[in-house]
Structure formats: structure tokens, C-alpha cells
Amino acid sequence: MESTDRSSQAKAFDEAKIGVKGLVDSGITEIPALFRATPATLASLKSPPPPKHLTIPTVDLKGASVVEKIGEAAEKWGLFHLVNHGIPVEVLERMIQGIRGFHEQEPEAKKRFYSRDHTRDVLYFSNHDLQNSEAASWRDTLGCYTAPEPPRLEDLPAVCGEIMLEYSKEIMSLGERLFELLSEALGLNSHHLKDMDCAKSQYMVGQHYPPCPQPDLTIGINKHTDISFLTVLLQDNVGGLQVFHEQYWIDVTPVPGALVINIGDFLQLITNDKFISAEHRVIANGSSEPRTSVAIVFSTFMRAYSRVYGPIKDLLSAENPAKYRDCTLTEFSTIFSSKTLDAPKLHHFKI
């Protein structure tokens, strides 16, 4: 009966097409049962604070020893702040404002983009795993495939279309540079990862976390790793992102002008665990202001792609044999779409 009730609640929420923002605008003072996190999730939110020496690494793209530092961060943390990346602050600010502007619109302006078809060029939704998860998360999402074939401007939301296209081009250039540095950190030719098409595809995720009346009972986005080679995240100043490191949840406190880079599952697989995919989450927003973030994942996401990937042969040896079987990104996406967000994916490909 309980699962049936949850299913009907999820169906009603989905069919309303108003998202979490619509719930907040309706004046609710308690979160619906659909969004109440599991006891295990709530217990993890009360875990002890990390030791002070555990701080998120920062990589200066124009600094000395950048290859060594980016390699160390990718190996030990799977996530780092990136400064001096070359993208103007004005562009970053317009990107955040654009995504926030979309989500802050009246429901009718957003409904034409609402969909559960994750192969669409552009879609607005709340919780991709709404029907599979034990509890929904307190966020709404605008998703868009931005490479290799960017959408037409007229197909994008008017409030943010131009900056979406401009920003995605900036991130493509930055991503290519990051893949060069990561290739060198692996001891490979600087073009190795790019030649593997790691930078070929992009998917933009514009997340909106409205203020929550009961932030201690739900979560912004549950713990997960990204199904990507690399994710470039732009966050506003509200905060809430946390990364799991050495058995602690550590705040990824916003740094003005910086981007957050995290290694995805695909990169962990092809580097044979040399680089690690960072498990992260976002706690529910208890402030009076909405939290907005923009992630660009270097991935085909839910679109079919037949290229086969496996551990890079140049990284393997008798002492370091392949830990994963070959697979396509489509196989990975199929598992992702059939599971809850927090379900591990990499172990399905372990040898």
C-alpha cells in the first residue's frame, strides 16, 4: 500500500508540471511525504564534521606544476576547485542569472519544456528518478544537450538561451584543456583523452534548489557519482554541495569566480581507477534564497553512442591488469536510467 501511495503521489506531482518551485509558491509550510528522505539518508546528514585538515584542493590553471596538481586532485579527491580558468566572471554571473531566471518564471512559461524523455534536446523536469527513488529530492532541473550538435536558439528558453550557447562554448574550450592536462598527468600524449572523444559530447544541467520549509527532512540531491568523463560545475554563493572523502562529508564551499571540477565514472573506468569518480550530494536549501547551479557534463548522457570504451591499454601492466570490461556509454546510460540516482554503477562493469 505504501509503495502504491508513493507511486500515485509521484504521478500527481509529475502531471502537475510545476516542480518543487511550484510547491513552494503554493505556500506550503511542510514538505509532502513524497520528499521525506529515508532514515539512512537523514542519519547521514547528521554525520560528524570532518577534521580541519581535509580541505577541497584548488588548482590554478595558470599556476606552476599544474599537471602534477591536477593529477593529484583527480587521484586522491576526484574533485577540485579550478581558478584562473579564463572564463570572464561576467559570463559566469549571466549563466547563473539565466538559469535562475528560467526556474523563477511562472509555471505556464516552463510547462512547454516539461518532459520525461531524456533524449530531447531541451527539457525541464524534477527528479529524473522520480518513480524509482525511495524519496524525491528538493530540486528542479533544466537539461540541454549542447554538443556535438548545439540546439537552435529558438528552441531554447528565451530567458537563458543565448547565455546557454555562449557558456557551453566556453566550457568546451576549457574542457579540452583539462583533458590535455589529465592526459599528461596519466603519462600519456596530451591529446590522448581528446582523441578518445572524451570532450566530444556535452549535456548542460541547470539545477534550482528552492528554499525548503523543512530542510532537515529532505535532501537537495542524493549522494551519487556522475555518468560522465568530467563535470564542470558553476555554483552560486548559497552553498550546499558536499563531497564524500575519507569517510566524511565535506562542504564544497563556493569560491567566487571558481569552478568545481569532478571526475566522472567513465574517466575512472578508462583510467582503471587511477582517477576516482567523486561521490557527492547537495543538502536541502534552508536559506531564504534559492540555490542555483549549472553543471556541464562531458558525456552523451542518455543518447545512444556505440563507441566502445575500456581501460586505456597504455596504463595496464602485469601488476596493473584491467579492472573493468569494455562497454559502451549506452550500456552505462541504460543502467543509470533503470536505477535510483544513488545506486552504484561502476561495479556492473567490474571484471
From Swiss-Prot:
One of its GO terms (biological process) is biosynthetic process. 2-oxoglutarate binds at residue 291. Residues 200-304 form the Fe2OG dioxygenase domain. Binds 1 Fe(2+) ion per subunit. Disulfide bonds: none annotated. GO terms for molecular function: 1-aminocyclopropane-1-carboxylate oxidase activity; dioxygenase activity; metal ion binding. Its EC number is 1.14.-.-. PROSITE patterns: FE2OG_OXY. Pfam families: 2OG-FeII_Oxy (PF03171), DIOX_N (PF14226). Fe cation binds at residues 224, 226, 280. Keywords: Iron, Metal-binding, Oxidoreductase. Belongs to the iron/ascorbate-dependent oxidoreductase family. PANTHER family: 1-AMINOCYCLOPROPANE-1-CARBOXYLATE OXIDASE HOMOLOG 4-RELATED, OXIDOREDUCTASE, 2OG-FE II OXYGENASE FAMILY PROTEIN. This is 1-aminocyclopropane-1-carboxylate oxidase homolog 4. The lineage of its organism: Eukaryota, Viridiplantae, Streptophyta, Embryophyta, Tracheophyta.
